[in-house]
């Protein structure tokens, strides 16, 4: 009986001391917050996407499109220097197999070439496809998605 009691006390002490020692270890993760104080145009992010170059693209509703390289923010929007996007109401982004970023805006989608960082118009096979694509580019677009085959899917109204 006494032996059982002593073993219980030693076990409790061992568990308590070992769990207390764990608090002294450094954290495995470095957590930081990306907000307006860090350089974001606003604190609301609609979508976050990482491209093939490693840049993180943050879609903000009202703040445009933000590119983050892990250290600095580069903001793109309506009237931006360098790249002027069609709107500041960015919904989401995706990348196709040709290293183009498809950006969904309320005013319609827009395509950016990630190599040149300039807006581009995707080439079309024939005039029917081009006419349909022009119609789609004028409609509200809330989501874009690139599947494994390289097809671009858009949710628009």
Describe each model-derived feature in a short phrase.
Residues 1-157:
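Carboxylate-rich, polar loop motifs that coordinate divalent cations or form catalytic acidic clusters
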């Amino acid at each position: 009986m006494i032996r059982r009691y002593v073993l219980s006390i030693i076990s409790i002490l061992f568990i308590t001391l070992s769990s207390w020692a764990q608090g002294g270890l450094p954290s495995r993760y470095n957590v930081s917050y990306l907000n307006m104080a860090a350089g974001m145009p606003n604190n609301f992010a609609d979508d976050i996407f990482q491209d093939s170059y490693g840049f993180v693209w943050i879609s903000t509703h009202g703040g445009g499109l933000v590119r983050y390289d892990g250290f600095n923010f580069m903001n793109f929007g309506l009237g931006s220097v360098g790249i002027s996007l069609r709107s500041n109401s960015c919904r989401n982004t995706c990348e196709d197999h040709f290293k183009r970023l498809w950006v969904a805006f309320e005013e319609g989608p827009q395509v950016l070439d990630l190599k040149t960082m300039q807006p581009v118009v995707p080439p079309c096979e024939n005039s029917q496809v081009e006419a349909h694509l022009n119609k789609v580019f004028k409609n509200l677009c809330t989501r874009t998605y690139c599947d494994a085959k390289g097809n671009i899917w858009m949710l628009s109204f």
